[in-house]
Design a protein with these regions (language model features):
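Secreted peptidase-domain scaffold signal
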Residues: 298-369, 430-454, 459-460, 559-571
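Subtilisin-like serine protease catalytic core
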Residues: 8-101, 115-118, 127-132, 151-155, ...
Length: 590
């Protein structure tokens, strides 16, 4: 894959364009200036209070601006993570009391999804029941597990703050399985960025799951100041911006990062409607261990967000993703990777949006999938069996989490096999969709890979005659992980150009190309087809760009021949004569 091409696209092109991010929070100063032209909807979800104003402490305006503020009032100085994304805002603050209320998570997520938002971020949570799986956690898992059924829906990434109660635990609904739960790390001053924000809520959940999932900048974060707020304070402020700390600030940073990941998937490599679990997997894939190597842990989860590491890792390192597979009870799905250079790192992340658990149960995992990695010599590594931040052999399978990770510092040369197993299927749905993200040396990356479908060539007349116009077709399928636009496909017959066509293919798509042909000579005609004949496109493999086949051509009609080319009549009065003729069927057809 052309790393420079992707890097340029990432640096200059990713800004959240085309993404709608929903924010559920206190209220919004929609006239601030940093949201101009990008408000896809602003609504109140507070019972009895139709106002969407941000009148108390400006929390919602600050959060929304961290996701996608344009930086207009600061000449770009305090720009959000995804400054060209659109905002769908749901105001939750009761103006009289300043408390947050809503009609429920189901209602909030449904209205946001129906408005076109595919990312929903929430910098709020319960002030009790820390670590517990609440009815709100159930609701979040219900919506996300439904929408990640890719054959019917478009997927949604939902994020919740871990809360600021430190060792008391993670605030529900951040305890939901399928959401991305975000803790905070230091943003500025001593220890940043590799130390935790002191008050960030720690895991695990009551049923033992790893939370938070990731961490993002959580202290001294400068963002928009609501002009309507009566008690906007913070540790610094000017007319248009102020500084707040907390996992409320970290979560929108992760949401903005999610918007960039989703933009990359949909616009750069052409993967439409990615599962929310794939966005989660890619953020975890690139997450960096902070301080001593000890992931996963109850402070940072799988590490701090690093988008470059998620999407364009250094060197000859590729990324492979799949969010279009599903599994049912007892099944095993395998992926193989040919690692051609020893001594390089390898990381695989499996995520799935699990069927909702129950607030009355002590066990929340319903569909238990397992991740395994098998080395060329047969050594097996299990998901989430870690020591000192890296996977080790042995250990027991994880039957608690719906995120499983394997990470190695060094791999041997040869074929490595990833296995996804459905070891226990407890939900009511037959199929469990999942997402997998892999990073490693010579791993199939996010490039397209158009190739010819075996045995797909067809001639409208199986054995055409000379001069007969027929239709010649061949099928091409994109077996890669990225889309390709207007890649040329050339056809030749007996080394002469038959024609060239352009084809565009999304991942997994198949197209049939058709050429008209009228053979000029009988006998064997050699057909050759070439994808990208001038080698101008980045592909996972160039070795499958050629296809050839022989077509037999017959001469038309019946041929008449004789031993004597002419017959001479000597008796002009004779009324009859004899001439031996031979008739030959030259069409190879009866």
């Amino acid at each position: 894959m052309g790393i420079n091409t992707v890097e340029n696209a990432f640096i200059t092109g990713l800004n959240g364009s085309g993404q709608i991010v929903a924010v559920g929070d206190s209220g919004l100063d929609g006239d601030h200036g940093d949201f101009t032209g990008r408000l896809s909807g602003v609504t109140s979800v507070t019972p009895g209070d139709p106002s969407s104003a941000d009148l108390s402490d400006g929390h919602g305006t600050h959060v929304a601006c961290t996701v996608l503020g344009s930086g207009f009032r600061s000449n770009g100085g305090y720009q959000g993570v995804a400054p060209e994304a659109d905002l769908y805002f749901q105001a939750m603050e009761d103006d009289d009391s300043g408390a947050l209320y809503s009609y429920g998570i189901n209602s909030m997520l449904n209205s946001a999804y129906n408005a076109g938002a595919r990312i929903h971020t929430n910098s709020w949570g319960s002030q009790s029941g820390f670590g517990g799986y609440s009815t709100q956690s159930e609701d979040a898992d219900d919506r996300t597990s439904t929408w990640d059924q890719y054959w019917s829906y478009d997927g949604m990434t939902v994020l919740f703050a871990a809360g600021n109660e430190r060792n008391d635990g993670v605030s529900p609904p951040g305890t939901a399985k399928n959401v991305i739960t975000v803790g905070g790390h230091k943003n500025r001053y001593s220890g940043a960025p590799d130390e935790m924000y002191y008050w960030s809520g720690r895991g695990p959940t009551d049923d033992g799951r790893i939370k938070p999932d990731i961490v993002a900048p959580g202290d001294y974060v400068r963002s928009c100041k609501s002009q309507e707020a009566t008690s906007a304070g913070g540790t610094w402020s000017n007319t248009w911006y102020m500084e707040y700390s907390g996992t409320s600030m970290a979560t929108p940073a992760a949401a903005g990062s999610s918007a960039l990941v989703r933009e990359y998937l949909t616009e750069v490599i052409g993967r439409q409607a990615p599962q929310g679990s794939l966005v989660k997997a890619l953020l975890i894939l690139g997450a960096k261990d902070m301080g001593a190597r000890d992931i996963p842990n109850d402070d940072e989860g799988w590490g701090r967000v690093d988008l470059v590491n998620s999407l364009i890792p250094d060197g000859e390192v590729g990324i492979f993703v799949d969010d279009r597979s599903r599994i049912r009870s007892g099944q095993v799905i395998e992926y193989t990777f040919d690692v051609n250079t020893a001594g390089k790192g390898f990381k695989a992340v499996l995520t799935w949006s699990d069927y909702p658990g129950s607030s009355s149960s002590s066990i929340q995992l319903r569909n238990d999938l397992d991740l395994e990695l098998v080395s060329p010599d047969g050594t097996t590594y299990k998901g989430n069996v870690f020591t000192n931040g890296r996977s080790i052999q042995g250990g027991s399978k994880d039957s608690v989490n719906n995120v499983e990770v394997i990470a190695l510092d060094s791999t041997a040369q040869g074929i490595w096999t990833i296995r996804v197993k459905d070891s226990q299927h407890g939900g009511s749905r037959t199929w469990q969709p999942f997402s997998i993200a892999v990073r490693g040396h010579n791993v199939n990356d996010l490039s397209p890979d158009p190739t010819f479908v075996p045995d797909s060539m067809n001639v409208s007349t199986p054995i055409p005659q000379v001069g007969e116009e027929v239709q010649v077709s061949v099928q091409i399928k994109n077996i890669g992980a990225g889309s390709v636009t207007d890649i040329p496909v050339m056809a030749r017959v007996d080394s002469a150009l038959l024609g060239e066509q352009l084809v565009s293919l999304s991942p997994g798509q198949t197209e049939e190309l058709i050429w008209s042909w009228a053979p000029e000579t009988e006998g064997d005609s050699a057909f050759e087809f070439f994808i990208d004949p001038n080698n101008q496109f980045d592909e996972m493999s160039d070795s499958n760009n050629y296809f050839g086949e022989i077509v037999i051509v017959s001469a038309p009609g019946v041929r008449v021949s004789a031993l004597e080319d002419t017959l001479t009549l000597f008796d002009p009065t004779s009324t009859t004569s004899t001439w031996d003729l031979t008739l030959t069927n030259t069409a190879l057809l009866e």
